[in-house]
From Swiss-Prot:
One example of a Gene Ontology biological process annotation: melanosome organization
Keyword annotations from UniProtKB, A to Z: Disulfide bond, Glycoprotein, Knottin, Secreted, Signal
Signal peptide interval: 1-22
Protein name as catalogued: Agouti-signaling protein
Highest taxon in the source lineage: Eukaryota
Amino acid sequence: MDVTRLLLATLLVFLCFFAAYSHLPPEEKLRDDRSLRSNSSVNLLDLPSVSIVALNKKSKKISRKEAEKKRSSKKEASKQKVARPRTPLSVPCVSTRGSCKPPAPACCHPCASCQCRFFRSACSCRVLNVNC
């Protein structure tokens, strides 16, 4: 009785392994170098060829010029943004990320609030809701 159960269990394991292994397509099966060399079904001529094209000096210069134009336009755009001076606020208030310990005035940003940490020893104005 024990021999029969052992034989049936072995047969069941073999059938499960065979069923799982047979569902793999032939390309995904594991192969070593020897089987690849001996197998004639894998033909290297069937693979698409790769063409390598060298860039000439003119195309390199054009791409460099384009890159320089992009860099200069980015620098000009950043200079234009920085050139705008901010109007000073006449109301006494604390800027964002500035220290706002309790005797200090309120935060300048309407959506900012004063948050304190470490038992109110370090306080700063922070914007909690970006979409405010």
